[in-house]
Amino acid sequence: MPFKRLIKSIDIGRAAESQAEKFARAQGFTIVERNFRCKGGEIDLIARHGEHLVFIEVRHRSSDKFGSAAESITQKKQQRIILAANIYLQKKGLTNMPCRFDVIVGNLKSNTGFQWIPDAFSCW
C-alpha cells in the first residue's frame, strides 16, 4: 500500500534527521533551527559553527540501488535550499552573516554512521 510506504519513509527521514542532529552537536555545532520551511524550499538543519551559519541538508538511503545519498542532491534541490537559506537570512536580519551549505549523508541500516560533507555546494 503506497500510503503506508510514505508514512514509513517520513518516519525514517525524521529518524535520520534526529541522528544527524546528534552527530552535528557532537562535532561542535549549535543547532538553531530544524526543518525550516518556506514557499521556495526547506532546510533540514540550521546551525552555528564558529562565525558561520551552516545550512545542512540531511540525506539518507537504505540502499545505493538508485545512487548514493549524496548523489540525490540535484542542482534543482541545491537551488531550492539556497532560496530557502536566502529567505531565512532575510527574515532573521542576517544577510551579512557568513554562511555555507553542508551535507550529512548516512545509512540507518548500516553501521557506517554519517559522513559530513562541508561546503558541499555554493550559491555563487
Curated annotation (Swiss-Prot):
This is UPF0102 protein HCH_05895. PANTHER family: UPF0102 PROTEIN YRAN (PTHR34039:SF1). Belongs to the UPF0102 family. GO terms for molecular function: nucleic acid binding. CDD domains: PoNe_Nuclease (cd20736). Gene3D superfamilies: 3.40.1350.10. InterPro entries: Restrct_endonuc-II-like, tRNA_endonuc-like_dom_sf, UPF0102_YraN-like.
